[in-house]
Amino acid sequence: MAIATINMTRKEALLAELARDLPHAPARIPMPASDPALAKLNQLGTHLWLDTGNLEEASKLWRREMSALTTNNTLANQVVQTGLMDEVIQQTARRVREVEPGISEDDLVMDVVFVVNCHVALRLVSAFDALVSVELHPAVGHDIEKTVRYAQRYYAVNPDRFIVKIPLTPEGYCAVARARADGIPINYTLGFSARQNYLATLLSRPNYVNVFLGRLNAVVADNKLGDGKYVGEKTTLASQAAVRELRAAHPDIPTLQIAASMRNAQQMVDLAGVDVFTIPPKAVEEFYAQGHKPEEITSRLHEQYEVHLNDDADRSRIEVLWTIDDTFKKLTQDLANRGGVNLTGDDLRAADKDYGTKLFSDFTAEEQAEIRAKGKIPETARWTGRASLDDLMTESALQSFTTDQNAFDDRIRKIIASA
């Protein structure tokens, strides 16, 4: 596998320099304490990541058994809204305008976001000497070339510690394949089903795939389709099994399964043995407070969690989350034979239509706005017959991040107006 090297423009080189120039870099935290229950999770094969971009919050919860932190548009926006990055924003805007005086406001915002995201992540690297996931601006989610370019640029800032998060879209599958061919570590995010991750693993070979399990429980409960219990857990374990099967059959596949969007400490116990947990602070605090003993924690990889649905719920629509049927496997193999680096998003949409697998809904701009207005948890009845549940959840997540990114961008616009 090639290691990414890129020829940077003058502006890109400046932005890389500004991204690495971390004023007041945090000191390395003292050697953290060990937690026996977390150590047991490590022994079962689970890597533990902390899901926060807030350094002070992370410092209180960090333990020796943890190896990475995840940031995203929402978490980065929370940091930016504190004012911590105002000076960085002003300096970056001034320097970029010196190099490119006629730059548009939109392009300048994208450049500043890149630098700020790097600073948020590098502060965590400085304090914890850990891997950190950095997420792309959602505006590039359907643009293969821009996605790959930003992945290369993030990787160039810190190739040893940065993992680039790329959102799950038809173009995303293709961009991930290209970025992985360059040797860039990728966290393919916003996954909600085993079949999405099966396709990603064989076609694109990211380092990580996700199931946002807490939101799956919520969408079933909030839409009164069932009690919502174990929907996300069942999907995560099904995806984990599929990823492990592909890893065993293809030694060159590095993909690990992430259990994301965890809501409570019990899910850490119920999913013990999954490759990676990315855990929000609230769930970690709860886990510590409950005082779990190592002997209570055993592998749950073969657990068959039962999902209770209401009699009037469309079971097939929900079961698609954890089901990978033969037709979908044929679709995946067909696309993999063609090679992810050779495909476009439209190629994936066309194949999905030909096979009748209904993975990609191709929402209109008006539909995206409607989804965005509803937030992370959509109204499923509205999309009956229009969108599969996994794709609807992915689009809802992407639109939710867009809302947070807009708040992030708006703060930058206000600051650069006076820079």
Each model region followed by its residue ranges:
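N- or domain-start disorder-to-order transition segments that initiate the globular core
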Residues: 2-53
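C-terminal extensions of enzymes
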Residues: 2-5, 318-419
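Short beta-strand/loop segments at the ligand-binding rim of alpha/beta enzyme cores
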Residues: 38-49, 158-163, 175, 180-188, ...
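Catalytic beta/alpha-barrel core
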Residues: 49-51, 113, 135-137, 160-169, ...
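Active-site beta->alpha loop and helix N-cap motifs at the rims of alpha/beta catalytic domains
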Residues: 65-68, 73-171, 176
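Conserved, mostly hydrophobic/aromatic
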Residues: 72, 134, 164, 179, ...
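Alpha-helix-loop-beta-strand connector modules within alpha/beta enzyme cores
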Residues: 120, 125-126, 156-157, 174-183, ...
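Catalytic alpha/beta core domains of metabolic enzymes, predominantly
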Residues: 187, 192-337
